[in-house]
Amino acid sequence: MPHETLLDNQGWFKKLARRFGPGHVVNTCFLIVMLFSTLLTWREVMILKDAYVASQRNHLGSVANVLDRQLQFNMDRLIFLRNGMHEALVAPLAFSALQSAVTQFEQRRVRHFWQLELDKRRTLPLYGVSDQFVARTTLLSRESRDLANELTATLELGYLARSSAMLTLETMYVSRSGFYLSTLPTAYGSDIVSRYYQYVTQPWFIEQSQRRNPQRGVRWFTSAQPYVADEQKKVTASLPLDHDNYWYGVLAMDIPVASLQQFLRDAAEKDIEGEYQLYDNHLRLLTDSAPEQQTENTLNDRERALLAREIEKDTLGGLRLGTHYVSWERLDHFDGVLLRVHTLREGIQGNFGSISIALTLLWGLFTAMLLISWGVIRHMVKNMFVLQNSPQWQAWHDPLTRLYNRGALFEKASRLAKRYREARQPFSVIQLDLDYFKSVNDRFGHQAGDRVLSHAAGLIGSTIRAHDIAGRVGGEEFCIVLPGATKAQALQIAERIRQRINDKEILVTKSTTLRISASMGISSAEEYGDYDFEQLQSLADKRLYYAKQSGRNRICASDATQEREKK
């Protein structure tokens, strides 16, 4: 029947309320509300975080794409020049001017330095060193059978290399055969030798050997040492020239770091938040978009190590380093990585910071209101519960000692004894009586006696275990029920109670203190296998009498005849 089900549910709720108490129910409900509100807020925070990370990547990606396109143009041009030289090596032009240049080379190759020039208006001059200079190192060689073709191909390169490339400072071809061509002119004289020597000793030339660069692709090199002035720092892209498995030389482009810095600063002007930083493949800072003399966002060694570990895993990503959020992306046409550093201050001042602050304030306001409501409702429920249950509490407890009264103690103890008998677990009882209590009433009055009883009850309650129960069963008599305690454990608890009562002094009047003692008797179900509480309490009371007869302030845990035998 529906009506019966409703009654059953009401009974179930009443049992739950009696078991846990209304305070626990209120706490649980508010805890669940707090938990769900926190989870919802946390979900919004995670969504906001993902949006912030995506925004950082979008800003970085737009700048990285533009920079990559600029660098790609230069790389495509470098590859175009190499392809042109390769075609000239395979099928050289039969121009008389080129043949004349080869003849001039044969005449001048023994000179300490020399120069070949076809047309000052349309091509670039060719500079070279002597056979003796080339023979000094195994890295250089003029033993190629296609030396004449390489020479004419380099002169043809002069027509193509004259046109400027974006961001490029210098474009050059350096041959292992002792000559070079550059978009930057060289004064005729000993500068030719020193410049060629400088070229062939650079990493971008040496590292392009077939052993060190077996892939024969573009490689990047930096000259960003601390002792190099900012205006002299540059990055170099180099590409080897090969034909029939023979390495002829290196095509290279120098890009000044100042050009890259200006590009990043132009990008930063459009993006008022964040700082862009360009690093090489060793995570050495090349340049950034920060104004002059402002380097507070530079990464330290520890942060660079953390970033390097993350970069090894993916081509782009983000990482929080202290109060900075660093998003990074590898460039496709540069052997390095571009970073966008966003500080906490910039984040707070931005749109996402405003949303985060508003979300935090809303959560804090809701939490504060929830806590205030919880306190008010819990206080109201507690008062109602106390008012509702005060007659029952008064019926079960002794008003003076706030321990169970005799009837309540016997009822609860009997139920506990039955439960522990079924579980075959130990069960013990302590009967306690305050020594010479009648003389306290006679000497100091009943008010002092009440104070002694309340004091003793407080010591008993603070000494027993959490699941033990204690009650006042007579004038100055107390009974303590110890479920789960053996006789030996009960003796230890009784001794602690006796010592605490005996050690504490009680202020019975304004100028008088009193030290009291207690005698106790102990009984346990393990002695005779009897779990009847009234029998155990009676036996403990009997042993209490033996303790008093033996001199008081002591504990008796066995029959008097056994005590005498022990003595």
UniProtKB/Swiss-Prot annotation:
Residues engaged in binding substrate: 441, 446, 450
Enzyme class: transferase
GO biological process, one term: cellulose biosynthetic process
Residues under site feature: Transition state stabilizer: 438
Cofactor(s) required, per the database record: Mg(2+)
Superkingdom, natural source: Bacteria
PANTHER family found in the cross-reference section: DIGUANYLATE CYCLASE DGCQ-RELATED (PTHR45138:SF16), REGULATORY COMPONENTS OF SENSORY TRANSDUCTION SYSTEM (PTHR45138)
Full protein name: Probable diguanylate cyclase DgcQ
